Design a protein with these regions (language model features):
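Active-site glycine/GP-rich loop and adjacent strand/helix microenvironment
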Residues: 1-14, 18-21, 98-104, 111, ...
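Active-site diphosphate/adenylate-binding microenvironment
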Residues: 2, 6, 16-66, 72-77, ...
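Short, charged/polar micro-motifs that form catalytic or ligand-binding hotspots
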Residues: 12, 75, 79, 110
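Poly-acidic low-complexity segments
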Residues: 32, 46, 81, 127, ...
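Beta-hairpin (beta-strand-turn-beta-strand) motif
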Residues: 68-70, 82, 108-111
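Phosphate/oxyanion-binding active-site loops and adjacent basic polyanion-contact surfaces
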Residues: 81-85, 116
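Residue(s) in the substrate-gating loop at a strand-loop-helix junction
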Residues: 120
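A glycine- and small-aliphatic-rich helix-loop capping segment at beta-alpha/alpha-beta transitions
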Residues: 123
Length: 220
């Protein structure tokens, strides 16, 4: 058993013991830590529960993140420790990209500034605060300004990350097709109700063509 599997099983036991909603679900499916010796046996709580129940191990929340609620009801993620959440996404970022200080980070997130409880907005705001400051920031629907910033960064060969919701990235690269050599594109989902739904491979091909890159990264 590797370290990841051991940690996963320990977390399953912790959630079972301290999370009343999750424990009830496991009991109803006749699964307990005594029955589980592999990560593939750990029960997955249906995501709809985050719309209908308070899913948490703690009685007090440091913050509550909410989904977009495109279907009418928002899902709620009760966070007991913001520092733990920050440690998680910062470590994930540095593992794949290095330090945010090494990049210009541009965020194309129309609609998110009006949603202060969005975890994506929280993460991007934190990373942007640590990034190089000249062009880093939120561009919302400012396609012309974003286009000029990307051109300037490409001309200076500056390492850049453009992170954005799917429909906005697609709208942008259709209006401003580019050939980017120093920019990483990260899509975060978010096509529902805004444009025709595409399978991931088809969507990524459109972004690759529009931005002139060989890979598209994802963050969900």
């Amino acid at each position: 058993m590797n370290e990841f599997e051991k940690e996963s099983l320990d977390l399953f036991s912790y959630q079972y013991e301290r999370n009343p909603v999750y424990r009830s679900f496991c009991d109803l499916t006749n699964v307990s830590p005594l029955d589980v010796d592999s990560i593939i046996q750990i029960p997955f709580l249906p995501v709809t529960f985050f719309k209908t129940h308070r899913v948490s191990c703690k009685k007090e929340d440091a913050f509550i993140f909410e989904s977009s609620g495109t279907a009418g009801t928002t899902s709620k993620h009760h966070v007991a420790s913001l520092s733990q959440y920050e440690h998680s996404f910062r470590k994930g970022f540095t593992q794949f990209y290095g330090q945010p200080e090494n990049y210009h980070i541009l965020a194309l997130l129309p609609g998110y500034i009006e949603r202060p409880n969005a975890s994506l907005l929280y993460m991007c705001r934190d990373l942007i605060s640590k990034a190089k400051i000249e062009f880093s920031g939120f561009y919302l629907n400012q396609f012309e300004e974003l286009h000029k910033a990307l051109i300037a960064l490409e001309e200076q060969q500056k390492p850049t990350i453009l992170i954005g919701v799917s429909f906005a990235l697609l709208d942008f690269c259709e209006q401003h097709p580019m050939q980017l050599q120093h920019t990483i594109i990260i899509e975060t989902g978010g096509m529902k109700g805004r444009r025709k739904e595409l399978i991931r491979e088809e969507f990524h091909q459109l972004l690759k063509k529009g931005f002139g890159v060989s890979n598209i990264h994802s963050e969900y």
